[in-house]
From Swiss-Prot:
Transit peptide (residue range): 1-16
Ribonucleoprotein keyword on record: yes
Name of the protein described by the UniProt record: Large ribosomal subunit protein mL54
GO molecular function: structural constituent of ribosome
Protein encoded by which gene: MRPL54
Entry's family note: Belongs to the mitochondrion-specific ribosomal protein mL54 family.
One GO cellular component term: mitochondrial large ribosomal subunit
Entry keyword set: Mitochondrion, Ribonucleoprotein, Ribosomal protein, Transit peptide
Length: 138
């Protein structure tokens, strides 16, 4: 019933500002609100979607060979402070150096008795099912 009253209004019930719709049946008034105003951006000629504030600068590139071999560059996420110093290899866990950082292994290269084999097989089956079901019609 409220919807009938709302749409039965003068047709201009969705204006840009909040106002009240009169209820013809009684003294109850419906409050209608709309979206907030668009933010005004400074700078640029008609720059749509331009961000207000500082312009971002590219990080400085380090060319010092001593610094590059003793510190990982770009790891420090804070504005102030020094970069982390690399430790000797003996202080890191052994599994870190056994990780596969190259291309992923193929299904034929894995042993069928391992969990990685079955996970990759399941992933391949899901990909195959998705390819086949893409062409099906309703």
């Amino acid at each position: 019933m409220a919807a009938r009253r709302l749409f039965g209004a003068t047709g201009s019930w969705a204006r840009w500002r909040a106002w009240e719709l009169p209820d013809p049946a009684g003294s109850v008034r419906l409050h209608v609100r709309d979206y907030a105003k668009r933010p005004v951006f400074k700078g640029g000629k008609g720059a749509k979607g331009a961000a207000v504030g500082e312009t971002l600068k590219d990080p400085e590139v380090c060319t010092d060979p001593v610094q590059l071999t003793t510190h990982p560059m770009g790891v420090n996420i804070y504005k102030e402070g020094q970069d982390v110093v690399l430790k000797p290899d003996s202080e890191y866990p052994e599994w870190l150096f056994q990780m596969n950082v190259g291309p992923p292994k193929k299904l034929e290269e894995l042993d069928p008795e391992t969990r990685e084999y079955w996970r990759l097989l399941r992933k391949h089956n899901i990909w195959r099912h998705n390819r086949l079901s893409k062409n099906q019609k309703f």
